[in-house]
Amino acid sequence: MSTAGKVIKCKAAVLWEVMKPFSIEDVEVAPPKAYEVRIKMVTVGICGTDDHVVSGTMVTPLPVILGHEAAGIVESVGEGVTTVEPGDKVIPLALPQCGKCRICKTPERNYCLKNDVSNPRGTLQDGTSRFTCRGKPIHHFLGVSTFSQYTVVDENAVAKIDAASPMEKVCLIGCGFSTGYGSAVKVAKVTPGSTCAVFGLGGVGLSAVMGCKAAGAARIIAVDINKDKFAKAKELGATECINPQDYKKPIQEVLKEMTDGGVDFSFEVIGRLDTMMASLLCCHEACGTSVIVGVPPDSQNLSINPMLLLTGRTWKGAVYGGFKSKEDIPKLVADFMAKKFSLDALITHVLPFEKINEGFDLLRSGKSIRTILTF
């Protein structure tokens, strides 16, 4: 029986308050309006950005359905939708690509002005929600909200992918893999023979290691306080792994001594102000490029000496690995299908959706790289 045009009742993980577990609730998902798409979720990854909301370091309106790294199948479309149709395999896009704003029209930029990152509204682009629970509207997260059996997104925030692609793997291309990999190959533009340092060896950090290797870096130094992640980092391309807790001097000084004055490229993939500064300081003062990849704590500032940049360093940041989401995500899936890279090493756990809180416990304890939830 077709559900198109009807309200769908399903299960979703609702975050009612920060610092509290998710609650599996019965929610109502309204039909898509014009230029919107309703998706039946199949797989979803647990990303550190979701946990930033739970911990309160990333502020978004509550109550909310989180989740933004996923794959699913189009259930129905609203009036005017032309780029996907019911039955298509898709990846929801936490960073939209409207194709019309000044950023979308700039070839090397991807931070579409329709995003819900800078000043989160917690709604779709028309300013309203499609979720209801206990008679109350529930907020969206980054315009996608994939911790739900069904979700509604704007057409500019969904990409059709290869019908043969395994959704339990390519869902990672919806955030973690593309963010890390792109930070190396597209944002920093790592050069062959260069030296790189990657701070943080979660799913995104390890994807950055993969990007550095793909770009031809000669040395890739992985930095983390969890030594259990070193074997995986070396498997994916790290040439050396170091733990800051093993040294009495600041880690940036250790890295500078190891690399004749500093690395060519550094990546902060944690989201801490102290490691952002260490990442900047460890790159060479005359030619180093440092990329902020981790989401920083809300409303906190860094103070730096401008001389650190005057000598020739470049300090930059990017969302989504610099990729233009709607056009580049299908290309990355095609590359995966062509075996240009593997995602297997990033997936350490697979759990049923109902065990979402267990999945977040694995993340917080450092026992997982990526946990995939299946519906």
Swiss-Prot record:
This is Alcohol dehydrogenase 1A. It catalyses: a primary alcohol + NAD(+) = an aldehyde + NADH + H(+); a secondary alcohol + NAD(+) = a ketone + NADH + H(+); butan-1-ol + NAD(+) = butanal + NADH + H(+); 1-propanol + NAD(+) = propanal + NADH + H(+). NAD(+) binds at residues 48-52, 200-205, 224, 229, 270, 293-295, 318-320, 370. The modification N-acetylserine is found at S2. The modification Phosphoserine is found at S23. Keywords: Acetylation, Cytoplasm, Metal-binding, NAD, Oxidoreductase, Phosphoprotein, Zinc. Its cofactor is Zn(2+). Dimer of identical or heterodimer of closely related subunits alpha, beta, or gamma that are encoded by genes ADH1A, ADH1B, and ADH1C, respectively. PROSITE patterns: ADH_ZINC. The modification Phosphotyrosine is found at Y35. It comes from the Eukaryota. It is found in: Cytoplasm. GO terms for cellular component: cytosol. One of its GO terms (biological process) is retinoic acid metabolic process. Zn(2+) 2 binds at C98, C101, C104, C112. SUPFAM superfamilies: GroES-like, NAD(P)-binding Rossmann-fold domains. It comes from Macaca mulatta. Zn(2+) 1 binds at C47, H68, C175. Belongs to the zinc-containing alcohol dehydrogenase family. InterPro entries: ADH-like_C, ADH-like_N, ADH_Zn_CS, GroES-like_sf, NAD(P)-bd_dom_sf, PKS_ER. Binds 2 Zn(2+) ions per subunit. Its EC number is 1.1.1.1. Its main location: cytoplasm. The gene is ADH1A. The keyword Ribonucleoprotein does not apply. Alcohol dehydrogenase. Oxidizes primary as well as secondary alcohols. Ethanol is a very poor substrate. GO terms for molecular function: alcohol dehydrogenase (NAD+) activity; all-trans-retinol dehydrogenase (NAD+) activity; butanol dehydrogenase (NAD+) activity; zinc ion binding.
